[in-house]
Amino acid sequence: MPLMKFKPTSPGRRSAVRVVTPDLHKGAPHAALLDSQSKSGGRNHHGRITVRHVGGGHKQHYRIIDFKRNKEGIPARVERIEYDPNRTAHIALLCYVDGERCYIIAPKGLKAGDQVIAGANAPIKTGNTLPLRNIPVGTTVHGIELKPGKGAQIARAAGAAVQLVAREGIYATLRLRSGEMRKVPVECRATIGEVGNDEHNLEKLGKAGAKRWRGVRPTVRGAAMNPVDHPHGGGEAKAGQGNPHPVTPWGVPTKGYKTRKNKRTQQFIVRDRRG
């Protein structure tokens, strides 16, 4: 998809870069697959901030996505490709031969009129979902389950892709874009192909307001705060952080410090993403 720049009628338009998406549906989404969602502003039930830099933004409906793809052996036709404000990837509206409709993450190359199917004996074709035990080694996949039947959890963002590099016993080995090598049960399902809208990372919002429309608030440097608010705060004029190593607002070392706590699943990581 080509990139679009704008006439520099303002600083925000001068800097903006958008991806041209002529194939996206221009009408309303399928109403039966919409759900309401309310804003939290990053606060919990006590009203305290638990997630920083969240607040405001345009109101959106949640699109109910079928991450399980458990209608086995029933072919479905792609009615259209749609924009989803809740994720970077586009979504595809499927219509099964029995009349049921659902949304899925749209793989790269999938277009209106294509046919997809899920099942153990599905052909190796973009958009089809089948267990890892039936997918040839070397195939690029996305939307992979971590536990059989739980639904897709890995590689769901725009342009995401994972390569199936090995299969031994009850586990398949995957190579993620981060460089991590990970084992997953061979009964877990995956969808063939990579996620579409792969040029999303080339977009430039152009102005701070476009970020606010998306519900993202500004990030303030710790060194610009007071000592009560951040370990880097305080000092006269432009003082440094004052620590031998930079830390988070809660004093945890940052910039490469490992914070992973789940030792139980560490055995499934064959190679760390840091190399």
From Swiss-Prot:
Chain spans, region Disordered: 224-275
Short name of one Pfam family: Ribosomal_L2_C
Keywords, ordered alphabetically: Ribonucleoprotein, Ribosomal protein, RNA-binding, rRNA-binding
One GO biological process term: cytoplasmic translation
InterPro entries: NA-bd_OB-fold, Rib_uL2_dom2, Ribosomal_uL2, Ribosomal_uL2_bac/org-type, Ribosomal_uL2_C, Ribosomal_uL2_CS, Ribosomal_uL2_dom3, Ribosomal_uL2_RNA-bd_dom
GO molecular function annotations of the record: rRNA binding; structural constituent of ribosome; transferase activity
Any one of the GO CC terms: large ribosomal subunit
Keyword RNA-binding carried by entry: yes
Entries under SMART domains matching the protein: Ribosomal_L2, Ribosomal_L2_C
PANTHER family: LARGE RIBOSOMAL SUBUNIT PROTEIN UL2M, RIBOSOMAL PROTEIN L2
Primary role: One of the primary rRNA binding proteins. Required for association of the 30S and 50S subunits to form the 70S ribosome, for tRNA binding and peptide bond formation. It has been suggested to have peptidyltransferase activity; this is somewhat controversial. Makes several contacts with the 16S rRNA in the 70S ribosome.
Family, as annotated: Belongs to the universal ribosomal protein uL2 family.
Subunit and interaction comment: Part of the 50S ribosomal subunit. Forms a bridge to the 30S subunit in the 70S ribosome.
UniProt protein name: Large ribosomal subunit protein uL2
Biological source species: Xanthomonas oryzae pv. oryzae (strain KACC10331 / KXO85)
